[in-house]
Structure formats: structure tokens, C-alpha cells
């Protein structure tokens, strides 16, 4: 076993200093990292436990400008139940947090950890398979292998899907994220957290070594804003989505004045679908309109040998999310 | 009850009283001749104090609180941990195996080869060598230093493309001609309506929560093994034979298996992990623990095999089945056996019938028995075929069953279940045109036949009564969680007429009398009469002591309701037991052969019904409710019996909708060998479940009980598949019924 040092920081500065050292991984709840280390898929020299920083990095608060500040270490249960989030505009966040994994996991798992998840691809996650994203081989094995849970959209040379179910609603709500790196804070649009070109060699996120996500920010939603998150699965208890959709619409005078639509679990990144969203704007909600948006959301899809069902299912999930958001 | 031994013919009443809401008892008289010394038979008229009531599981609290110690929990000072090196190659030959470097690694105490150079490697996961060391990290490091090389051969893990697999068309239907049979051709030609369809099921793994393995400890040439097993005595013999070189015999081996975290048919043998454990402990001269990890459990300990099945058949103008032709192909792993499929035979008594099965070998872990081996697969295919045939003939599925089912017990069960479930109304309910959610109901029969291991007098039970009034009932057989301890306690307390709290049942130590493996639903019918006989003998001894004490003739002393005595001269149980002295009453009951006379019924009957709700947009199937009626002979502990039935229904939901082994064809390796991607039904996926235990006095031995491992496992997936057919008005002929298949069925229907 490769020995590793375990850092329990007293404050963010100490965590950041440790995080900057080579061959270091950051641990939130450790829901997945502990498993990967036990399986020796990840063998860092140093693990920095961020949980002692919960006092400064956890919690939900409404800021003066009406935005919602979500600490990176806020648990999914806190997110689901927090009083500041009981608002129809933020329904998608609560729905997503509340349907993740199991109550045990939700009580422990953190918001940042959920967004920064490593792929669940079964080729990547077994050292027996020499695949490119796993760093063990020349190509993606899932493209030509068993790919019923893999990508149908936005893939280049690796058909992994991004497993986060909080990322789609946060993107749909226009969220930003703050990081700290070498003493500097930066706040950017959430989309920048994901690689512009999700190639096999790229990690799931764009964080630099030593960079720590400290918070998410959901901007103040306009009057009439509503959101919804839906996902398809093969079972209701503890399963990953086969497709997911988060939508945010602003309803004015019975019409959709603005819309955002983001797909999850269908590509290597959570995927904003601006053309589908644009088709909704200026229209009154209707089944036909939602069908049209669903078709646009999956326009250009490139399914694999075993996952074309995701197109049918995914379109249904888009329609359902739009229906729930405009009901 | 009189404690005198009957030696002559006894007249008993067998059968059952009318089910609730039905008229007419189905009772018959039988004359039976119990063996000399056996307890007199219980029958349909017996009034029980305890049997059939809602007692709690006797070890439920110990299990729920963690006090129960499973093999996984056993630990000793200085105990080593161990792992097995597994083949990454699905087929080939071991060409090099160097263990020296591993043996020199820090913390490593023993390394053993499990294959020799030149041996065949049969599947990904085949055991090559094993290492024991001070902790799992050290062991894993050493495993990584073992140099194993292979001469790799071409492999195949898809039985549908095996050399002798049948031709299949693009829709998955067998396209090969049926073998010629003039009689069958004629029967099909005469039929008014015929049907022909292909069905398929995927591989399900047992997924016991406690994995295979255990702890071994040697003391000189004596070996003790705490083993997670369904067959303590089988494993004892297996290990003794395998370890003959270590100068031991069967008498030197003791197996302990007091609590087992599930087996479902996968744990009949000690296996390579059991042998490795003992070899390592011998070599290291220290206790060794070796428990498989979840991936090994999924990939090396057997499975319920996949199968491709085709049926064709026809009905006459009256809706009676006149022809039934069946062929099936089972995936059978490298052993090329164990993939067989069973189908119901009670619908086709007057039909021209043919059944063929062929096992197809692939380079993968072979099947092992799993709850009603072959049955859930075959019943799925056969019962869905019957519903499709009934639909073509324009007959309601229930009417179709009633027209064709030749078993009286199930005729009553069909009607009872239909009433309870509200079949007619649910079946008549039409889905609104264009509705997103589609509802449907379906049904299936079940059958399993086993009345114990008669003629195995070696199977026995020890019963002890102590002077403090406590009672022990002991079996060396194991209990993989099914309720055996509770069953033994209830039988013993009933026979002695004492409070259940005074009885302590212990199982799983091979120093106690032998019992069967937990397979084929044989434990309850094998051991319940032995437990009763043991209590019966112990009671006689107590009666004799009391008779002597009271100065009355022993023959007329009774022991019931916590009192022992004659007429007005009665001692309380506690007082009577004080006469026993320091050594307990200590007797051994035996399992006599079943009575010569015909039992009321030779097998167990059941019926299940299911309702589903399908999201036609996403293809997601939710089972909303299920009802089952199940016969198991005499119901001994009602709540536990129901738990066995409900558990089987849950496993059936999982089999019908979720579970499947997914293999990577190129590497021959399972892709979803964990509990994240191998999907097992969880609480939010469960329907409302209800069952009715149909207690039948069977009259085959002094108790008349049958087991419940198999019988309730047969029908569930078939009933769900039929409900899906009803909801969609199109069949999904391939388990598990995942959303992609539902959408395909809807698209094909148009």
C-alpha cells in the first residue's frame, strides 16, 4: 500500500497550502474517494480532509442582493431542507438534492463533492480495463463496448457521462462558483468548472492543482421564475440517472419570458441546451411546445450501440421537467 | 397429549378447511402407521397452542442489534487476513507462477498456490494463489507481486453465440426449425388457436450480503472453521477430503456456522476460498480470515443462469391446451451444466407435450442453484406464453388457468387470490386513450415439490431439558436466515407444552446431530419431525420422573400447558424439572421415513398476482401491489413463513425489473460486479405486498410441514411480466424489463 499523509486543516489557508503540494487530493465527505482509494484506483501521497472547515464552508444564506450563497461543504440534506430554498424558483435544486442516492449519503455528501464527482463509467473504474480516461490505455473502451449508461451527446473521444445531478439545476439557475487558489479568490460562471472540450485526457473539472471550491452562488431569480429537475432511472432507490433535465422558466402573463434548459447524464459534461431553451421563449406552455423543446434538446445526438433508448427517455424527461416547472 | 407411543394404525384427517370466503372443506381420511417410537401424527383437527401463531423470530433482536456473530465477525488474537489472486484471463493455461517475492513481502505469513503451472484457466476470477498476512494492505501488496503468466486462448462469454447455440433472428426469436415430430405437428394443426414465441432471461447473481469465506484455526491436527455456508456437514466432508495430505479425517474437522448472511443456493460448498483458508492457516500456524470481496462474490460464486426459451402451443375450441412444445437453452458457464429450466406441467395433462433443454458452455463462472433452480426462468417464459396464447384465443388469463390447471388446491387458490386481489375489476379497467401511465395486472402459478429427506435417520435433533426448566433444541445444520431456529423452538415448545421463552435453539455446529443442506426447501420438512421426536422422547423421560415422584403409573402421565402429572396430581413445569438433577434429560430425535400412505399432496402450490404502473414516456415500470397465496403444508411460525414469501416476492420484483449481470465480451469480465451497477430492488421500488399462508395438513409425517425457500420464488417475475403485457397490450419477452425494452415494445406495437 502506498502510504499517504492525512491533513486535517485548522482553517482554509492551511487547507489551501496543503492542497498546493504535489500528488494531493481533497476530500469532502469521502463518499467516493474512500472507495477509490481502497480499490487503489487513486493512490495520492496526501489527502486533505476539508470537513473540519464546515464552520466556514458549509451553510446556506441569502445575501443582500437576493442571491443565495451555498457553502461548498453544505450537505445535500441541508440543501434539500433549508428554509432559504423553499421557493418555486429554486425547486429544481431541492428536487435534485432530495433524490440523490440514499438518506445516509445525503446526510454526508457535500454540494461541491457532488458537482466534482468522478465518472461512474465501468471501464474507467476498474483497473482491469486499460482505458484512456482511466489513464491506463490508448482509447475509450465504452465506445465499442457495453455502453447502455454512456453518452449520447457532446462526446468527443470518451463517452463517459458526468454523474452530478446538482450541476444541471445550478447551471439552469445561472449559478457561479468561488474558488481559492494561492490566496486569491475567483468567482466564475459554473459552466467554466467543466472542460470546454471534455476529452478523455481531461479530468471532469477545470480546477487547477491546489484550487479549492469554497461556495456556489445562485443569483436572485426574477419574479415569475420557476424551476424543476427530473431524472430517469432504472430504479427509484439509490440509482444514477440515465438521463436528467433541469429547467428554469420565467413566466409572465401566461407566456415563457425566459428559459434555461440543461441536460444531465447524457454527456461528459452537464449540457446546457440554449437552442431548446430559446424555442420556449415568447410561447405559452403547451404539450406541443415541450415536445418541440425536447426534440431540440436532443438535436445532434449521437447514440451508441446500446443506448439509443436515452433519446426517447431523455425527451420524456425534458417534457416532464417543463411540465412541472410551468404547472 | 398422551405420551404413549402408538404402534398401530392411526386414522388422521388430511387436507384443509375452506379458505376464507369459500365453501367446502377439502378434508380426507387417511390411515397412517407411524414408526415405532415416533410421536403420534398431527393432523387437520389438531388444536395447537403455539404452532401457526405469530411468534417473533427468536434471533431477530440479536441480528438487528449486532449481537449475532456471523463468520465475517469472528476474530482471534493473532488472526491473519487473506486474499486470492484471480485470473484476469477468461480462458487459457497458466504458464508461470512465481510466489517467492510475495512470500518475502513484509507482513506476509503464508502463500499457497491454488493452481499449478500447466493447469487450465477457465474464467476471469479463477483462483490462482492465496496470501495471508497481518492485514489486507500487506496481503494486497503481496498479491500484486505474484508473477502469474498465461497462455491466453480465444474465449466467449455470450452463450447466444456459442457453437451449438440456436439461430436467432434480428428480433431475438429462435429462427431454427423445431425438431420433427409428427404427433406434435398434428396436434398443432388440430388446434383452433396457436402461438409461437421466444423468451429470454439474463443472469442473476445470488448477492448474499455476507460474502463467501470464513475463519480457520488449527490446533495440532484438529481444524475448526467458522464458515458462511448452507451445508455444514457437506463442507466438513469436503474440507476433510481436500486436506487429506494434512493427516486429518472428517472427525478432525469442526464447522461452525451459527449465523449466515444469506446463501440462496450459492453456499453448498466450502469452495476454493474455504480450502485456501485452511491451507493458509496451516502454513502460517495462525488463525486466518478470508472473506471474498463484492466483486469476487458476484463473479466467482455462481449465479442463476440466463436462458433462451421458446414455446409453441395451441388450444382447442373450448380453450383447453392441446399442444405444448418447449425448448430451452441455458447459459452454463465453463462447466456446461446447471443451466436447465423447469416449466409447469399441470396445465398440459391432456396435451401433446414435448420438452427439450440444452446447456451451452461459455468461459464464465458456472451457475449454482438459486431459490427454485430453473423455475423462475421457465415460469416466466411459460406463463407469459400462456397469457399471449389466451389473448389470441380471447380468453381471460384467469379463466384460461381455471380451464387448464389440474390441481384442486390451486383451483381454490386462483379463486381466493382473484377475490382478494380484485382481479376481475382490475383486469377490466382500461387505460385512458393517450394516458401517460398505463396500468395492468397479471398472474402466475407456482409449484415446488419437496417433503423432506425421508429415510435419512442420520438427520437428528438433540433435545435437552435442564433442571432449571430451560430446554435446548440443537441441530448441526445451518440456518442461512430463513427461520430454522424459530421453527425448532416452536415445535419443541408445542410438544412439551411450555412457554417458547424456555426453549433455546442452537444450530450450525457440526458437533450436534446432522441435518440437511439448506437446499430445495428440505430443512423444515426434514428437521421439524426430528425436533418433534426429540421433544417427544424428552417429554417421556420427564413424565417417568414425575410418575415416580407422584407414585402413579408413567403411562398415563401427561405433560401439557406447563403442567406435568396425572389427574389432579400436577406439578408445575419448573417443579417437575427440579426432579431432573444435575445432568439434563438428553435425547436425540430422529427423522423417520415418511408414512407409506399417500400424502394429501406431494408438492406445494401457490398463486401470485401483480399490478404494475408503467410510464409510457420513459418506459419505467413500477410494481404497485402484489398478492400471493402459498401452501407450505403445516404453517409453524406464521410471521416467519410470511416473511419467506414476501422476501421471495421482493427478489422476484428485482429479477423481473432490475438484476442482470453485464459482461464485457472482449475481456470476459463482469462490468457491474458491485452493488452500484448491479441493480437490486430497494425500498422505494417495492410494491404493497400481501400474502396468505395456506396451511394444509399433508399427513406425510408426524408434523406435515414443507419448506419455503423455493415455493414462493417461482411465480413473482412471471406475474409481473404478465402485468406488463396487460398494461402495454404488448409483451416484453426478455427479463429484466428495463425501460429500454418497454419503449421498444411500445414502439413495435405502434
PLM feature segments, named:
Chain B
Residues 1-174, 273, 588:
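Flexible, low-hydrophobicity surface segments
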Residues 458-512:
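Catalytic phosphate/nucleotide-handling subdomain of diverse soluble enzymes
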Residues 259, 263-285, 289-292, 484-491:
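Thiamine diphosphate
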Residues 142-145, 236-238, 264-270, 299-305, ...:
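Short acidic, glycine/serine/threonine-rich loops at helix termini
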Residues 2-22, 104-105, 245-252, 282-290, ...:
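C-terminal catalytic domains of large/alpha subunits in multi-subunit enzymes
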Residues 161-162, 254-273, 299-300, 332, ...:
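FAD-binding core of FAD-dependent oxidoreductases
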Residues 53, 58-65, 175-214, 306-384, ...:
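Glycine-rich loop/linker segments at domain edges
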